[in-house]
A protein has these predicted regions:
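Short amphipathic alpha-helices and their capping/turn segments at secondary-structure boundaries
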Residues: 1-12, 47-57
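Gly/Thr-rich phosphate-binding beta-strand-loop-beta motif of the actin/hexokinase/Hsp70
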Residues: 2-31
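Short hydrophobic/aromatic-rich motifs at helix boundaries and adjacent loops
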Residues: 22-25, 57-61
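Short, ordered loop/turn segments at secondary-structure junctions
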Residues: 26-28, 44, 68-70
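N-terminal phosphate-binding loop and adjacent alpha-helix
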Residues: 35-60, 72
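Acidic beta-strand-to-loop metal/phosphate-binding motif
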Residues: 61-69
Length: 72
């Protein structure tokens, strides 16, 4: 898992929806996630490339994928 500058483990969280993938970044030993943007769903290869780019940009060593089914 990648380390952030403080030496903690960086986790990128994905909330996959029909039109967007929401991104949140957290540090494993902190537990609070913060918004990190979103990816518009497009062609599968372009969307996958955008996810890989986000992982690299955030320096994530772990990826957590969620599937939000409702807002309640």
């Amino acid at each position: 898992m990648a380390d952030d500058p403080s030496g903690s483990k960086v986790v990128l969280c994905l909330d996959v929806g029909e039109r967007h993938i929401g991104l949140a970044r957290t540090v494993a030993d902190v537990g609070t996630a913060f918004p990190a943007g979103f990816i518009d769903m497009g062609l599968p290869t372009a969307t996958a490339r955008a996810v890989v780019d986000s992982v690299e940009l955030e320096g994530a060593g772990c990826l957590v994928v969620g599937l939000p089914l409702a807002l309640d």
